[in-house]
Amino acid sequence: MTLWINGDWVTGQGALRVKRNPVSGEVLWQGNDADAAQVGQACRAARAAFPRWARLSFGDRQVRVERFAGLLESNKAELTAIIARETGKPRWEAATEVTAMINKIAISIKAYHIRTGEQRSEMPDGAASLRHRPHGVLAVFGPYNFPGHLPNGHIVPALLAGNTIIFKPSELTPWSGEAVMRLWQQAGLPPGVLNLVQGGRETGQALSALEDLDGLLFTGSANTGYQLHRQLSGQPEKILALEMGGNNPLIIDEVADIDAAVHLTIQSAFVTAGQRCTCARRLLLKSGAQGDAFLARLVAVSQRLTPGKWDDEPQPFIGGLISDQAAQQVVTAWQQLEAMGGRPLLAPCLLQAGTSLLTPGIIEMTGVAGVPDEEVFGPLLRVWRYDNFDEAIRMANNTRFGLSCGLVSPAREKFDQLLLEARAGIVNWNKPLTGAASTAPFGGIGASGNHRPSAWYAADYCAWPMASLESDSLTLPATLNPGLDFSDEVVR
């Protein structure tokens, strides 16, 4: 039984789904998808649970959420292993994901009060108050690259605000989704407050098509995000928060420490096997001898990055991609870039056929026309050379996306210029593109989102504002507007 609906674990009535380790092929999880009827049941359960959950005090909801944080802590080793085995990422990285999930609780509580708490301003004849109210029933679509942390970034603030939820994990990480839901069950959530439906496209379409949804929170690809945006068009009553990908540029200016710059670039482009939405996809490198030296060093160090299994010792920097199909898509993208005229610097290589262990790829595209403005979700870095910083910024902005952008340079004035001209929601200076703070908003512009950033700003899309003018007594004003006569004289 792999679906959690109205507090009960039930068997899906849809197609059988089997999840295997992307490197070894070991069967990790199997269960049946939720069919459309079960998705409807989950929605009705969430709707029925909403009034009581929303009427609880914030403190009562906070107790359950903090109990979940404690369960994450006590089950950290087990959940780390589940995430690592299912995604293929190394154990060390899965552990950092669980730690981020734990830290998210306190951050979300603080964000709730600062972003969407209550405010009161005294007035001469009363007060003006601001409160926030939950939307109702929200659908949460989770991604596979961080199957615990990223859905958690929607679920926790939504629950704190008083919403009820239907959660659909990625069909590529059902085991992680189920494991997290079982911890929520132990935390004592009332039946129907949080529901789990497993499945792929058909389940997702049934969920997003529900008429009784009050909103949908999504993290994933731009293609799917656009489909959801079109599907919910003409329904302004539903909140839609989209966090999508990017074709992210990293600008390398003059650097004093080449190895430090190479380390930052590798962290930006290849961590999580390139499967982070903020990963650098485009390296913009200044022309000249120093740029040549940097590029040679980057290729040499990247060549020594050998992907490994989730439990290898010593631990590898990167593991496998989410599937062998995903790895093959990166290889295909590389081949297409080379056929367009790209100059190969480091070819990606599958270490073993039928697995997702893929070495990084680097290819120079300077002077090549018609390069697709698409996100290749894997360890593939394209390089362009530039002559001056104004050109670098123009190249950085030459994308329909706008998630992250970074600069490696000792010059503060160049970063200040980038801050003014960059079109990206995250702009870093001498820090990896993949570095983000939960105490800041996380999101982008253009094809990277719909102006509903998550992380610190997740509280904003989990509640709506209610403004009130209030007075505990009613008296006739001392001065009346012109034309109003409350005298006792009879008008004839």
Curated annotation (Swiss-Prot):
<feature type="active site">
    <location>
        <position position="277"/>
    </location>
</feature>
<dbReference type="GO" id="GO:0019545">
    <property type="term" value="P:arginine catabolic process to succinate"/>
</dbReference>
<dbReference type="InterPro" id="IPR016163">
    <property type="entry name" value="Ald_DH_C"/>
</dbReference>
<dbReference type="GO" id="GO:0043824">
    <property type="term" value="F:succinylglutamate-semialdehyde dehydrogenase activity"/>
</dbReference>
<keyword id="KW-0560">Oxidoreductase</keyword>
<dbReference type="Pfam" id="PF00171">
    <property type="entry name" value="Aldedh"/>
</dbReference>
<dbReference type="InterPro" id="IPR017649">
    <property type="entry name" value="SuccinylGlu_semiald_DH_AstD"/>
</dbReference>
<comment type="pathway">
    <text>Amino-acid degradation; L-arginine degradation via AST pathway; L-glutamate and succinate from L-arginine: step 4/5.</text>
</comment>
<comment type="function">
    <text>Catalyzes the NAD-dependent reduction of succinylglutamate semialdehyde into succinylglutamate.</text>
</comment>
<dbReference type="InterPro" id="IPR016161">
    <property type="entry name" value="Ald_DH/histidinol_DH"/>
</dbReference>
<feature type="active site">
    <location>
        <position position="243"/>
    </location>
</feature>
<dbReference type="InterPro" id="IPR015590">
    <property type="entry name" value="Aldehyde_DH_dom"/>
</dbReference>
<keyword id="KW-0520">NAD</keyword>
<dbReference type="InterPro" id="IPR016162">
    <property type="entry name" value="Ald_DH_N"/>
</dbReference>
<dbReference type="GO" id="GO:0004030">
    <property type="term" value="F:aldehyde dehydrogenase [NAD(P)+] activity"/>
</dbReference>
<keyword id="KW-0056">Arginine metabolism</keyword>
<dbReference type="GO" id="GO:0019544">
    <property type="term" value="P:arginine catabolic process to glutamate"/>
</dbReference>
<comment type="similarity">
    <text>Belongs to the aldehyde dehydrogenase family. AstD subfamily.</text>
</comment>
<feature type="binding site">
    <location>
        <begin position="220"/>
        <end position="225"/>
    </location>
    <ligand>
        <name>NAD(+)</name>
    </ligand>
</feature>
<dbReference type="InterPro" id="IPR016160">
    <property type="entry name" value="Ald_DH_CS_CYS"/>
</dbReference>
<protein>
    <recommendedName>
        <fullName>N-succinylglutamate 5-semialdehyde dehydrogenase</fullName>
        <ecNumber>1.2.1.71</ecNumber>
    </recommendedName>
</protein>
<dbReference type="InterPro" id="IPR029510">
    <property type="entry name" value="Ald_DH_CS_GLU"/>
</dbReference>
